[in-house]
């Protein structure tokens, strides 16, 4: 192993092809897109230099600003939720759990390895759009909170938060394992 890591030819043999593929697939399109963003026109026809006019028009667009606001909320809530829940779970593993520690850690980490389609189907059933049909609405109804029964993913006021809960649940196990490893 040390022989390979000390050999610059061996390192180049592994790194250079990957860099070439990455440059062709990722970097070239990013640079082209950035270059084309300073022009107006149709591809193959007439192109005019627009400077920063395209960006000025973008930041005046209400739809773009709304999408940017929603994305910022999502990133903030999901990041804080995943890291915060992961930290709390890792502290629970270290200082509170005495029995069944391995089983609980496995169950908490399980959503990380679930396929995205399975998680989507699971939460589609939990947040079922028809009231009183999904798991969450049935639970709320049986506990007497009938005024909270609603289509969770079907309305703009609750859809973002429902998706945030799903993403936090999926990734908090990963962060809990990372933090738990740091606590050991």
Where are these regions (language model features)?
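A structural signal for multi-pass alpha-helical bundles of membrane permease subunits
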Residues: 3-184
């Amino acid at each position: 192993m040390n022989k390979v890591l000390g050999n610059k030819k061996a390192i180049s043999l592994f790194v250079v092809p990957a860099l070439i593929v990455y440059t062709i697939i990722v970097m070239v399109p990013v640079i082209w897109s950035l270059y084309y963003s300073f022009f107006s026109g149709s591809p193959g026809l007439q192109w005019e230099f627009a400077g920063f006019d395209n960006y000025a028009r973008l930041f005046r667009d209400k739809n773009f600003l709304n999408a940017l606001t929603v994305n910022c909320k999502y990133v903030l809530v999901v990041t804080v939720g995943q890291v915060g829940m992961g930290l709390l779970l890792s502290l629970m593993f270290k200082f509170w759990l005495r029995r069944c520690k391995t089983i609980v850690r496995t169950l908490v980490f399980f959503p990380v390895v679930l396929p995205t389609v399975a998680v989507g189907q699971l939460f589609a059933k939990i947040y079922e759009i028809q009231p009183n049909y999904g798991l969450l609405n049935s639970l709320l109804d049986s506990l007497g909170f009938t005024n909270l029964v609603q289509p969770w993913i079907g309305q703009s006021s609750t859809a973002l938060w429902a998706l945030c809960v799903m993403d936090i649940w999926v990734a908090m196990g990963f962060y809990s394992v990372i933090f738990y490893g740091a606590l050991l």
